[in-house]
From Swiss-Prot:
Pfam families: Ldh_1_C, Ldh_1_N. GO terms for biological process: lactate metabolic process; tricarboxylic acid cycle. This is Malate dehydrogenase. It comes from Brucella canis (strain ATCC 23365 / NCTC 10854 / RM-666). InterPro entries: L-lactate/malate_DH, Lactate/malate_DH_C, Lactate/malate_DH_N, Lactate_DH/Glyco_Ohase_4_C, Malate_DH_type3, NAD(P)-bd_dom_sf. Substrate binds at residues 83, 89, 121, 152. Belongs to the LDH/MDH superfamily. MDH type 3 family. SUPFAM superfamilies: LDH C-terminal domain-like, NAD(P)-binding Rossmann-fold domains. It comes from the Bacteria. Catalyzes the reversible oxidation of malate to oxaloacetate. It catalyses: (S)-malate + NAD(+) = oxaloacetate + NADH + H(+). The active site is at residue 176. Its EC number is 1.1.1.37. The gene is mdh.
């Protein structure tokens, strides 16, 4: 049986981490693509040389030509420029949109059957543009955001309650930006919803609000500490979880940026929602009930994403 082929577009910090994780999990053979000559080849060789120590079998190929991604089962896109301190994800729009146009053309030509996971920021606008540029069906193109945002929320909650991260579930909806909507009501510790834990005296509403805000600022906090780049371990782990659910048809319920066709009152836009990811890509979009306040927050988040998509059309009218 032929191994799966995983193509990584962009061989920076996230790309290298993705390649290593794909190897460790034996998800398939890996092609690292980058426009910088030597970078994907060097990282691929370095990771391949770790395989005898870690005990995994996979081929790693570095490439500077899109032809190398031909026939990929999964394509994960990290190409583009990362944030620097003081920048919002939205500041990257113009530069990274041009990158998405090139990446989309490469995928369209060489990997039209692939399941595509976009990580490039500003995420919701970039995955929307990438789907249009590539011409792939919407259920085969997603943005990695909600898994990461939920993971941050879960980690902060596990710290607050001094419990295992495995017993914390968390729910984050909306765009991958300052307007994301972490939902306390749908987040639990061992099945107990957060509002009940407040009543039980485990935490206070004020502390919970601070954790929710820290989740929104999670990426910026790391950018501020690193000063020369942005997060890469957690984003890579999150994208690999989505890829694994697709490749193994696990049907995991995962929050990703998916194209909506009327759910939550949104059409033809990519927004973070809970989905079922299996062998057909996005197999189901789960529409949960939102109260008035949550709906208002979600609508505000959607409006922010819509503004970015409009800005994209201003730069690249072909996206209309």
């Amino acid at each position: 049986m032929a191994r799966n082929k995983i193509a990584l577009i962009g061989s920076g910090m996230i790309g290298g981490t993705l390649a290593h994780l794909a190897g460790l999990k034996e998800l398939g053979d890996v092609v690292l693509f980058d426009i910088a000559e030597g970078t994907p080849q060097g990282k691929g060789l370095d990771i391949a040389e770790s395989s005898p120590v870690d005990g995994f079998d996979a081929k790693f190929t570095g490439a500077n030509d899109y032809a190398a991604i031909e026939g990929a089962d999964v394509v994960i896109v990290t190409a583009g420029v990362p944030r620097k301190p003081g920048m919002s994800r939205d500041d990257l729009l113009g530069i990274n949109l041009k990158v998405m146009e090139q990446v989309g053309a490469g995928i369209k030509k060489y990997a039209p059957e692939a399941f595509v996971i976009c990580i490039t920021n500003p995420l919701d606008a970039m995955v929307w543009a990438l789907q249009k540029f590539s011409g792939l069906p919407a259920h085969k193109v997603v943005g990695m955001a909600g898994v990461l945002d939920s993971a941050r929320f879960r980690y902060f909650l596990s710290e607050e309650f001094n419990v295992s991260v495995e017993d914390v579930t968390a729910f984050v909806l909306g765009g991958h930006g300052d307007s994301m909507v972490p939902l306390a009501r749908y987040s639990t510790v061992a099945g107990i919803p957060l509002p009940d834990l407040v009543k039980m005296g485990w935490t206070s509403r004020d502390k919970l609000d601070k954790i929710i805000q820290r989740t929104r600022d999670g990426g910026a906090e790391i950018v501020g500490l690193l000063k020369t780049g942005s997060a890469f371990y957690a984003p890579a782990a999150s994208a690999i979880q989505v890829a694994e659910s697709y490749l193994k048809d696990k049907k995991r319920v995962l929050p990703v940026a998916a194209q909506l066709s009327g759910q939550y009152g949104v059409k033809d836009m990519y927004v973070g929602v809970p989905t079922v990811i299996g062998a057909n890509g996005v197999e189901r979009i789960i529409e949960i009930d939102l109260d008035k306040d949550e709906k208002a927050q979600f609508d505000k988040s959607v409006a922010s994403v819509a503004g970015l998509c409009e800005a994209c059309i201003g730069i690249a009218p072909s996206l209309k």
